[in-house]
Amino acid sequence: EILIDFHDTPQFIYDNSSLKEIQACQHVWASGLRTEPITIPAGNKSEMMVISFKKGMAASFFPFPMEEIADSVVDADLVWGTDFGELRERLLGTKDIDLRFRIVEEFLIKEFRSQMAVNPCVAFAISEMTERPDALNIARMNERIGYSKKHFAEMFRRQVGVTPKSYLKIMRFQKAVK
């Protein structure tokens, strides 16, 4: 996810147990796939835009393997330079929600179109895990895909951020919560 905060006051991430501030986030930041919950307050005057990618499909938008940002929150400038800061400034120039979405969509397509290739085997696995997490057996899926367990797990981790087994656990949890 990419989070754009329209206020200048930092948002804080809190330790889930002690609720102590552990990280400040300001303006624009990126969050990898999470295997654990994150505690961020959303006050009644918060104004943010969150870009959530389709499940497992964020890799095309990041300049490094997704495993490097899993369970992390990183300042967008460290990931992409100042491009997202400039995007934020453009978004601050309008209050029209529909226009903000069009600006973000145009920006993402312009900046990342050439990188939007997705490994078809990983896309297939994500689709299977998302659509029927309770019925899926990873070993049988690996056999269908045709890669060794180790090779496929590495491909999957680089594109999604976690192993197929961890991703399947997340999908099962999300299904149970629904």
How should these model regions be labeled?
Residues 1-133, 137-139, 143-149, 162-163:
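Alpha-helical bundle regulatory/interaction domains
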Residues 159-163, 167-178:
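Terminal helix-turn-helix DNA-binding modules in bacterial transcription factors
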Residues 155:
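Residues within the DNA-recognition helix of helix-turn-helix
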